[in-house]
Amino acid sequence: MARIAGVDLPKNKRLDIALTYIYGVGRTTALKILDTVGIDWTLKTDDLSGEQVNTIRKELEDNYKVEGDLRRDQIADIKRLMDIGCYRGLRHRRGLPVRGQSSKTNARTRKGPRRSVMSRKKK
């Protein structure tokens, strides 16, 4: 089992699919990495030699932000938006949709479960 960027890649998958288990690497990036390194993307993870694993690992470390570094940068970017007080930062702070979606009736994923409003009884 190959371990790259702190992630155990699945044994019986094609290499381009296995690399997508790393946070920050999708299909396009995986194919680009394999093309740069010169490894066939149809290879299974089991068939990789130690040298090939090391070349993929080196390519990822040198040219891509993945896993912890990427997560840390994304959190820092959101924190910066909230600190400068821009509109997007306010939406993040309030837990509302950030990209202009309507929030009058929908947006339940972002807002969470409905909070019921208690009606006042008439005397």
UniProtKB/Swiss-Prot annotation:
Name of this chain's protein: Small ribosomal subunit protein uS13
Coiled-coil positions: none
Region (Disordered): 95-123
Oligomer status and interactors: Part of the 30S ribosomal subunit. Forms a loose heterodimer with protein S19. Forms two bridges to the 50S subunit in the 70S ribosome.
Cellular-component GO terms for this entry: cytosol; small ribosomal subunit
InterPro entries the UniProt entry points to: Rbsml_uS13_C (IPR027437), Ribosomal_uS13 (IPR001892), Ribosomal_uS13-like_H2TH (IPR010979), Ribosomal_uS13_bac-type (IPR019980), Ribosomal_uS13_CS (IPR018269)
GO biological processes: translation
Ranges of biased composition (kind: Basic residues): 107-123
Gene that specifies this protein: rpsM
Matching Pfam families: Ribosomal_S13 (PF00416)
Family: Belongs to the universal ribosomal protein uS13 family.
Protein's job: Located at the top of the head of the 30S subunit, it contacts several helices of the 16S rRNA. In the 70S ribosome it contacts the 23S rRNA (bridge B1a) and protein L5 of the 50S subunit (bridge B1b), connecting the 2 subunits; these bridges are implicated in subunit movement. Contacts the tRNAs in the A and P-sites.
Keywords tagged on the record: Ribonucleoprotein, Ribosomal protein, RNA-binding, rRNA-binding, tRNA-binding
Domain of life: Bacteria
HAMAP family on file: Ribosomal_uS13 (MF_01315)
Keyword DNA damage recorded: no
Record carries keyword rRNA-binding: yes
